[in-house]
């Protein structure tokens, strides 16, 4: 590689060059679906240093299409850093000069952790559609085992956005003694009927692709690209607000004249197709199906006759709940539903709705007020954990 094409110097507020690690587990993991994973791998990255008392660990939980690479660069050839680099690094909201940050790829994922693309030891072939259904609870149990492996008894904070926020909530309920603070961003305590409907449309787009082969597409040396492309296009529409789409694309055409056909004419069409095409070759379709079903299934209040306040009763840590004004996928009203339940249950909670034009995807971006509030809360976490001079 010509040195002129390499990044000359990594940003000063970057965690720098990072490398994934793999933890292998031979202790069987019983799953909510009734099946058991006899063994499995979890791929993860860490940023910062674990202190002597092991009290500065922070866990990052990823969203639907996320993975372990949340910050930094794998090489100087990388065009982009990890997916949450805007918030993880020296001096950033999740300050790696203070905190030891862990980010992993969940079970069922397609970025190294055991999932549909991995080999099923019982058959010698890829798991494919035989990989068991996962739930948010299953992920949290596996994450707790990773914490055990790393010698971390209690996290200073567990943090996540979107589906990651649901995992944070589940952590506070399943392992209240192991989480000192919870940060739930752009999330919901359960999906609405509309959100389940969006997920079902995406799944049907994938499953109806002739190249899907009932999930065994790898054995046919193909990919259900068309279906996954459509699923991602639908998803992107829900991740952006109407205002964001309007300001970014409006009704702009790719050329000066209408072509009176079905080829791409509007810039927004071009954008959606590009996003879909890119995703269709970089993400696994079976993983997408699993992740959306885990979203659908999450509903901690269901076991309490729909009483969310009763469901959150086991939680014992302070919460920061963040929503965004134009997020219509998980709107502020759903965050307030969680906040109201926490208040009724007598739990300490701080809530803010950030005025942002960027819709659901705002949780990924460096919004000024969002960063300030996030950093302030994490500063309090550091203070309460005695990490100010770490």
From Swiss-Prot:
Q: Which UniProt keywords are listed?
A: Acyltransferase, Amino-acid biosynthesis, Cytoplasm, Methionine biosynthesis, Transferase
What's the name of the protein?
Answer: Homoserine O-succinyltransferase
Against InterPro entries, the record matches this protein to: AB_hydrolase_1 (IPR000073), AB_hydrolase_fold (IPR029058), HAT_MetX-like (IPR008220)
What Enzyme Commission number(s) appear in the record? 2.3.1.46
Principal cellular location given in the protein's record = cytoplasm
Q: Where does substrate bind?
A: 232, 361
Organism of origin is Litchfieldella anticariensis (strain DSM 16096 / CECT 5854 / CIP 108499 / LMG 22089 / FP35)
Q: Where is the signal peptide?
A: none
What SUPFAM superfamilies does UniProt report for this protein, alphabetically?
Answer: alpha/beta-Hydrolases
Q: What is its pathway?
A: Amino-acid biosynthesis; L-methionine biosynthesis via de novo pathway; O-succinyl-L-homoserine from L-homoserine: step 1/1
Question: Where in the chain is the site Important for acyl-CoA specificity?
Answer: 329
Q: Which gene specifies this protein's sequence?
A: metXS
């Amino acid at each position: 590689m010509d040195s002129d094409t390499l990044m000359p110097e990594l940003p000063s507020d970057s965690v720098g060059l990072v490398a994934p690690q793999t933890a292998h587990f031979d202790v069987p993991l019983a799953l909510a679906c009734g099946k058991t994973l006899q063994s499995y791998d979890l791929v993860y990255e860490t940023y910062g240093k674990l202190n002597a008392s092991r009290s500065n660990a922070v866990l990052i939980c990823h969203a639907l299409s996320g993975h372990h690479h949340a910050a930094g660069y794998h090489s100087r050839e990388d065009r982009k850093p990890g997916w949450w680099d805007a918030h993880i690094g020296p001096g950033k909201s999740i300050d790696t000069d203070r905190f030891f940050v862990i980010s992993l790829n969940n079970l069922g994922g397609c970025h190294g952790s055991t999932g549909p693309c991995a080999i099923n030891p019982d058959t010698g072939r890829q798991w494919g559609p035989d990989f068991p259904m996962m739930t948010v609870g299953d992920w949290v149990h596996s994450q707790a085992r990773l914490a055990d492996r790393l010698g971390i008894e209690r996290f200073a904070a567990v943090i996540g956005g979107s589906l990651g926020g649901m995992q944070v909530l589940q952590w506070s309920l399943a392992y209240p003694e192991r989480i000192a603070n919870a940060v739930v961003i752009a999330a919901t305590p359960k999906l609405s009927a509309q959100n389940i409907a969006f997920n079902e449309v995406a799944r049907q787009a994938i499953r109806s692709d002739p190249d899907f082969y009932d999930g065994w597409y790898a054995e046919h040396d193909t990919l259900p690209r068309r279906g996954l492309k459509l699923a991602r296009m639908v998803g992107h529409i829900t991740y952006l607000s109407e205002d964001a789409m309007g300001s970014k694309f409006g009704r702009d055409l790719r050329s000066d004249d209408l072509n009176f056909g079905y080829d791409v004419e509007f810039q927004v069409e071009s954008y959606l197709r590009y996003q879909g095409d890119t995703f269709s070759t970089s993400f696994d379709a079976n993983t997408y199906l699993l992740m959306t079903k885990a979203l659908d299934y999450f509903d901690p209040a269901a076991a309490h006759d729909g009483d969310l306040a009763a469901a959150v009763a086991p939680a014992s840590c302070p919460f920061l709940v963040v929503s965004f004004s134009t997020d219509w996928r998980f709107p502020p009203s759903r965050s307030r539903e969680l906040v109201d339940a926490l208040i009724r249950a007598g739990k300490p909670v701080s809530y803010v709705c950030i005025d942002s034009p960027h819709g659901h995807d705002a949780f990924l971006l460096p919004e000024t007020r969002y960063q300030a509030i996030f950093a302030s809360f994490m500063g309090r976490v550091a203070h309460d954990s005695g990490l100010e001079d770490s």
